[in-house]
Amino acid sequence: MPIAIHTGDTAWPSGLLKYSHPLTVDEAAVAFPDVTFVIAHCGCPWFADAAEVACKNANVCIDLSGLVEGNPKPLMLLERQRGFLRQLHTWLNYLGNYEKIMYGSDWPLVNIPLYIWMISHVVPECYHEDVFYNNAVRIYSKIGKLLEKCGG
């Protein structure tokens, strides 16, 4: 069973960032090589560290949930977040293994159609089916079994 670990910024002033940094997942991944770990939120804002931890450890994947919040207009989102999205794109390419990357929304904090649109502009189109569906079904194998039962 995979273990998803919250990484990245915390919503609470009393939360300690050292415990939500993606490098903490490296320690767990090395100690438990038979467990699959998912770095939630791609370690935002520490994309480089999250990508390196996933690159180094065969048992670590990344989800792209909760990277933006709210309901901005698409062009406004691209304009305001251009540097952020460019950085995310750079580090996903550094990882170079789109089989380790999954879509995630962090709903209800985001507008789902807008979020899908944003992620589709960061992930190369040839990997969309894997990132938006196949990887989650493979990594969270119980989901695939449930979908089969439902005919999906």
Functional labels for PLM-detected ranges:
Residues L67-E69, W107-V110:
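Short Gly/Pro-enriched loop/turn and capping motifs at secondary-structure junctions
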Residues H89-T90, Y94-M102, P108-G152:
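Mid-to-C-terminal alpha-helical segments outside catalytic/metal-binding sites
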